[in-house]
Amino acid sequence: MSIKSRIRTIPHYPREGIMFRDITTLLKDPVGLRITIDEIAERYRAEKIDKVVGIESRGFIFAAPVAYALGAGFVPIRKQGKLPAETISCDYQLEYGYDKIEIHADAIDKDDRVLMIDDLIATGGTMEAAIKLVQEMGGKIIECCFVIDLPGVGGSTRLRQQDHPLYSLCSFDD
């Protein structure tokens, strides 16, 4: 059984016309979860990753165990106001307005080899902002990894056009 087949699709959620990709069915399946983490970790095992960055909130689910498997540190990127120490931030565009993400100012060291992980790429706006934060701190991004790509929304194309390497475990074209 593939990773993709373990992800539930919920039509018209959270609003009409949206096909929501629900990872909870993947997460509750111990084999599916293990396969997902192992596949990501194996891809980067030889890359000498220093830090694995997880994007709030579902990116944390995958990034922390991958960091553990690689012997790397885990770094959360969170929405504004959620991190307790000094932060740096970046605005990014939403469908209707803007939001802000933050990272602790001491989370990434210059020349750290960084793997970025999120559960899904749609527009690419959140990951684009996260990339800016890591690069501003002097981190070297090895790749941006997603469990799910929604290529029809355009985020993966957008990041590739900016020369950001990315990888996804599965994609949904509809």
Swiss-Prot record:
Catalytic activity of the protein: AMP + diphosphate = 5-phospho-alpha-D-ribose 1-diphosphate + adenine
Pfam families (UniProt xref): Pribosyltran
Coiled coil feature spans: none
Name of the top EC class for this enzyme: transferase
Gene Ontology molecular function: any one: adenine phosphoribosyltransferase activity
Pathway field: Purine metabolism; AMP biosynthesis via salvage pathway; AMP from adenine: step 1/1
EC number(s) given by UniProt: 2.4.2.7
Function: Catalyzes a salvage reaction resulting in the formation of AMP, that is energically less costly than de novo synthesis.
Protein name: Adenine phosphoribosyltransferase
Organism annotation: Nitrosomonas eutropha (strain DSM 101675 / C91 / Nm57)
Source organism phylogeny: Bacteria, Pseudomonadati, Pseudomonadota, Betaproteobacteria, Nitrosomonadales
Gene it is expressed from: apt
